[in-house]
């Protein structure tokens, strides 16, 4: 187990922020994301929706820092975990290794605390300060409970619990559930999920919903699942096409999203009718002018 460096990033908890400012991403000459602004805090529950190919996963990767936007800035204070929709097939790790890597920081914090306690008992100079710092790190990470959190999630998601099983021997769904359980146990400041319900049964979805609603950290989820949208999302980012090519951000949960979409469509229909009326008026004026030219009046 590696020792925890005092420079290792720690969760920011209530101070955590993830801010995307004027973010744009191009695919060739085609804009995928167009000047997106989004602020996520430790209490945010955000869902990203839209048709296939509209940039939902792209936005998730931009927020995670794994994709650099063509323009705009993403700033983050705090730790982050992401579960992608696609899972690698050649992963030779065991379930136990995946769990250990996911909670490496809490495990290292406990090892550092044990070492600091031994130094304190031996009367080593400066041991009190090192012990106090190690204890603070362990408390911030809730390190004593990390392994239990993962085990609870593995069982609740019906994931593989045998630590000796190789990930490449598991199905795609099983690998995803192991990854998801590890992330839930790691307890990062921000949890980013791409279509998590694809590999969950009803009981797994209920467990995930409870976890996302109660966790002490921000959530961003790409999903088409209406139950998850209704039960978890408080803010919904809609990447579907709009007249001005701008993403729409709706508050007040799924109900607010549906009402916002309805109002947006009514505005669009009203504007379309106004334009058609104006077009008809211009055509009538043009016809009248042409008739006067022909008749000489």
Predicted regions and their residues:
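ABC ATP-binding cassette signature C-motif
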Residues: 1-270
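Intracellular alpha-helical coupling/juxtamembrane segments of multi-pass membrane proteins
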Residues: 261-289, 293
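Extended alpha-helical coiled-coil "stalk/arm" regions
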Residues: 296-297
């Amino acid at each position: 187990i590696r020792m925890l460096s005092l420079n290792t990033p720690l969760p920011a908890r209530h101070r955590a922020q993830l801010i995307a400012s004027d973010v744009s991403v191009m695919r060739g000459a085609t804009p995928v994301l167009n000047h997106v602004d989004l602020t996520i805090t430790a209490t945010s529950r955000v869902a990203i929706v839209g048709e296939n190919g509209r940039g939902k996963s792209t936005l998730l990767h931009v927020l995670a820092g794994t994709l650099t936007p063509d323009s705009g800035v993403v700033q983050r204070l705090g730790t982050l975990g992401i579960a992608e929709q696609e899972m690698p097939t050649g992963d030779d790790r065991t379930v136990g290794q995946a769990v250990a890597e996911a909670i490496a920081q809490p495990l290292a914090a406990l090892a550092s605390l044990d070492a600091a306690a031994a130094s304190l008992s031996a009367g080593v100079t400066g041991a009190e300060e090192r012990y106090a710092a190690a204890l603070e790190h362990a408390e911030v990470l809730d390190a004593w409970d990390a392994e239990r959190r993962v085990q609870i999630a593995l069982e609740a998601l019906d994931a593989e619990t045998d630590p000796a099983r190789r990930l490449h021997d598991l199905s795609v769904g099983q690998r995803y559930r192991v990854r998801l359980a590890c992330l839930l146990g790691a307890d990062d400041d921000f949890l980013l999920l791409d279509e998590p319900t694809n590999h969950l049964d009803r009981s797994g979805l209920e467990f995930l919903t409870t976890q996302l609603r109660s966790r002490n950290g921000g959530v961003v989820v790409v999903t088409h699942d209406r139950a998850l949208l209704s039960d978890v999302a408080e803010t919904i980012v809609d990447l579907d096409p709009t007249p001005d090519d701008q993403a729409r951000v709706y508050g007040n949960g799924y109900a607010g999203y549906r009402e916002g979409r309805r109002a947006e469509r009514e505005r669009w229909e009203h504007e379309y009718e106004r334009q058609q009326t104006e077009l008809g008026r211009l055509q009538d004026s043009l016809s009248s002018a042409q008739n006067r030219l022909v008749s000489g009046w």
